[in-house]
C-alpha cells in the first residue's frame, strides 16, 4: 500500500486549493489535492509539509489531521491521509508545472477529478457546526426565533432532536424547521419514517439503532451518535456519511459523567475515513481545538442557540 499525505488548503473565504496533474505523471490532466508520498521514517504531517514546500512553495502554520481513506487504483492501492491547512507562509504557485485553482467545495468547476477525491469533496460539504435543537428547554417559539438568527449567522446543518414531543407535534415542528432552513441541511434524530415523510435531508441514528443496522438508511446524509471505537467502526462499515462522538467534556445534560477528553477523542478518531463531530460541553469557540484533535467540527446543543 502506498501511503500519501494530502492537504485540504482553505482560503479565508472557505475555498479549497486544487492542482492539475502535469504530463509525465499518472493521470495527467486530473485535478487533486496537493500532497505526495510519505517517505520511510517520515510522519504523514512532516511529509505533507515537505510536499507543500516542494510542490507549491508554502510552509503550513496551521495544519491539523482530518480523515484517512484507502482507495484502489488499477496500478496501486493508496492510503490518503488528509490534513486541514488553514494558515501558511508564502504564496501558492505551481512549482512542478501544475496548474492551481481555488474552488468552492460546494461547487467545484474544474474537471476531471482524481476518483479518490470525489468522496473527500462530499465530506467537505458538511459544515463545521452541527446545531441540535433544544425546544424542550427553550420552547418552540423561542427555539424557532433563535434558529432564524442562527441561520442568518451562518448555521447550515441542523439536527431535530426532541425526545419529549409527541409525534404530531414533532412533525409540525420539523416542517417549520424545514421551511425556515431552506438553505440548510436538516436531519431528524432516530425517526426514519418521519424523516422520509417530511423529506428531510438526513437521518441521525442513535448508537443503539446503529449497532442493530445492517444497511445504511436511504438518505442524502446519514450520521450516528457514537461513544467509542467499536461504534465508530460500525458507522464506517455501514458507509455512513459522518459520526458524532462524545461526550468530550463534562456536560449538564449528563451530570456525574466525566467526559472522554480531547486526547481520547483524538486517539479514537485517528485514521477514521468519515468526518467526526465532537459533542459534549462545547462552545462555539471550541471549534479550533476540536479540529486540532482531528474533528471535522463540533455538535452544539445549548451553545448553538446563544
Task: State each model region's role.
Residues 127-142, 221-226:
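Active-site mouth loops of central-metabolism enzymes
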Residues 131, 158, 195, 235, ...:
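Conserved, mostly hydrophobic/aromatic
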Residues 82-86, 92-125:
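NUDIX/MutT-family hydrolases
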Residues 11, 69-91:
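Active-site-adjacent beta-strand/loop module that shapes the phosphate/pyrophosphate-binding cleft
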Residues 171-190, 207-210, 215-228, 257-283:
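Alpha-helix-loop-beta-strand connector modules within alpha/beta enzyme cores
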Residues 206-215, 244-256, 281-306:
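Glycine-rich phosphate-binding active-site loops on the catalytic face of alpha/beta enzymes
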Residues 1-16, 68:
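Conserved N-terminal beta-strand and adjoining loop/helix that marks the start
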Residues 15-55, 66-67, 185:
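Conserved Nudix-box catalytic region and its N-terminal flanking loop in Nudix hydrolases
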